[in-house]
Amino acid sequence: MAALRSWVTRSVCSLFRYRQRFPVLANSKKRCFSELIKPWHKTVLTGFGMTLCAVPIAQKSEPQSLSNEALMRRAVSLVTDSTSTFLSQTTYALIEAITEYTKAVYTLVSLYRQYTSLLGKMNSQEEDEVWQVIIGARVEMTSKQQEYLKLETTWMTAVGLSEMAAEAAYQTGADQASITARNHIQLVKSQVQEVRQLSQKAETKLAEAQTKELHQKAQEVSDEGADQEEEAYLRED
């Protein structure tokens, strides 16, 4: 046992003396070992990061939103929104077109009234000039009328699409979308009806002005005939 202790003591002392004699070699071994394990640490860390990136993130599932009924309600809501937008745009265009037509009608009414008030006070040249203005206004009115009639056809198509979308929303259980679409349809119909009534009122005034102009002209011709007959009668006397 004493011999074993003596051998251990000598070995430790020899190792200590060895490290004191060759410190550079010992440090070199440490550096070599350190350099050896550095890439391994980097590799492990990089691989661990890549592993984390590759793990998919679980998303919360929404079983109710994936049902066929829910998907249909969502789709029909988008349809009602789209048809309502289309209806709004066509309604705006139609109202603007009817308003422009109504203005053109009132312009023609004013010209007819002025012409009627000047009957018998104009020479033939002045009368021709007034008639040229009236003809130009009539052409403008006809052009505006054709434009609004064309838009009216598109507007009626938009109304039909909105009504079908509202019905589809009702059938699929999207009650709120159906109610909103139907209320919107009623609103635009009332707006168009209001401007239509204004245009119809203008057309009535135009018809009255034209009738008055015809009566006035007929009266003027009759008066001229009576004057000629009276003049001829006086000549005979």
UniProtKB/Swiss-Prot annotation:
PANTHER family per the UniProt record, alphabetical: DIABLO HOMOLOG, MITOCHONDRIAL (PTHR32247), DIABLO IAP-BINDING MITOCHONDRIAL PROTEIN (PTHR32247:SF3)
Keywords: Apoptosis, Cytoplasm, Mitochondrion, Phosphoprotein, Transit peptide, Ubl conjugation
Protein name as it appears in the record: Diablo IAP-binding mitochondrial protein
Organism lineage string: Eukaryota, Metazoa, Chordata, Craniata, Vertebrata
Alphabetical GO biological process terms: intrinsic apoptotic signaling pathway; intrinsic apoptotic signaling pathway in response to oxidative stress; neuron apoptotic process; positive regulation of apoptotic process
Species in which this protein is naturally found: Mus musculus
Residue span of region Disordered: 206-237
Domain of life: Eukaryota
Family affiliation: Belongs to the Smac/DIABLO protein family.
